[in-house]
Regions:
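C-terminal accessory/tail domains of diverse enzymes
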Residues: 1-132
Length: 132
């Protein structure tokens, strides 16, 4: 995860990770088998995420098929929502939906740069969104 320019997105991603950990702990404590995938598949998804961000297609590892990143992320959010509610972080998790809908800081920075090819404007955008 890259650094987010909006605090609420950072909190949302923290809530997502927290809920995922809760889910994994419960599976482990129940004696259920945890998923295991080849490193090559995990590395490919990391590369695709770094290269294409939310606009890419990741490999849905259990199904071994490519799906839009946003769609896969929404499925994960839906899957762990109950855990976030148990933890009291469901409101923060809503920010992940906002991030998926409106895009992340990197996407906004690209739009700003392509509009005027001025890195100062990109920095201005980051400062405005970070301090908002």
């Amino acid at each position: 995860m890259d650094a987010q320019t909006r605090v609420e997105h950072t909190l949302g991603l923290a809530a997502l990770v927290q809920a995922l950990v809760k889910e994994l702990c419960e599976r482990f404590e129940s004696g259920l088998e945890l998923s295991s995938y080849p490193y090559e598949m995990l590395d490919e998804n990391k590369f695709i995420a770094a290269r294409y961000g939310l606009d890419g297609e990741l490999v849905d590892l259990p199904r071994e098929e490519r799906v839009p990143t946003r769609s896969l992320a929404r499925r994960v959010v839906d899957r762990v929502r109950e855990h976030a509610e148990d933890l009291g972080s469901d409101r923060e998790l809503d920010a992940v939906e906002d991030l998926l809908e409106r895009g992340n800081g990197a996407a906004r920075q690209t739009v700003v740069y392509e509009a005027n090819h001025d890195l100062r404007e990109v920095v201005k955008e980051v400062v405005e969104k970070t301090s908002a």
